[in-house]
Regions:
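Conserved Lys-Pro-Asp/Glu-containing loop-to-beta segment of HAD-superfamily phosphomonoesterases
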Residues: 97-128
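Alpha-helical substrate-recognition element adjacent to the catalytic core
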Residues: 4-85
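Acidic, Mg2+-coordinating phosphoryl-transfer loop and its flanking beta/alpha structural elements
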Residues: 116-153
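Acidic carboxylate-rich catalytic motifs and surrounding loops in phosphoryl-/glycosyl-chemistry enzymes
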Residues: 64-68, 94-105, 141
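Alpha-helical structural signal in soluble globular domains
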Residues: 52, 85-89, 127, 131
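A general structural motif
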Residues: 1-2, 57, 93, 112-114
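Structural recognition of alpha->loop->beta junctions
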Residues: 82-98
């Protein structure tokens, strides 16, 4: 059975909102907050559980929105910054999707029999969920502990 887990970035695994002057920088088309953001969880522990999930058949990816107010050039810069962050902090991921702000996240990925989204936004989680196929993990909780539940620990 094909399975996948997707992570949101901003506010879920990357502390964008903790970067000084993040909003001003984004509004002036400065992508550096996406690189400067610190991880929101212990990335070694996240890598440990994700690698076990990968060995168990899961695809691990990121689905992240681009800036709300943007231009094509800024979208490219943000995408590159987010990829750089992901490669540094989450080198185990198999997929990366940077999509326009507000696009439903389930519309951009391949269908799997079991699909999880780890996200801090309740509305995004509600839009993702279905009774059988698509489930969510609230990133406001301990995401590493929640992922261990999928492993069976």
């Amino acid at each position: 059975m094909a399975k996948a887990i997707y992570f949101d970035m901003d506010g879920t695994v990357a502390d964008l909102y903790g970067v000084p002057n993040w909003l001003h920088k984004l509004r002036t088309c400065d992508p550096t907050p996406y690189i400067e953001a610190k991880p929101l969880c212990d990335m070694k522990k996240l890598a440990e559980v994700c690698n076990i999930l990968i060995n168990g058949g899961y695809t691990i990816g990121i689905i992240t929105w681009l800036s709300k107010d943007s231009t094509p050039d800024y979208d490219n810069a943000v995408t590159m910054a987010k990829i750089e962050w992901a490669q540094h902090h989450m080198p185990f991921i198999n997929e990366f999707h940077a999509i326009p702000y507000g696009v439903p996240k389930h519309t951009v990925v391949k269908r799997y029999a079991e699909m999880w989204l780890v996200d801090d936004n309740a509305d995004v989680r509600a839009e993702w969920e279905t009774p059988k196929q698509r489930k969510t993990i609230n990133a406001n909780n301990d995401i590493v502990a929640e992922l261990w539940k999928l492993v069976g620990r």
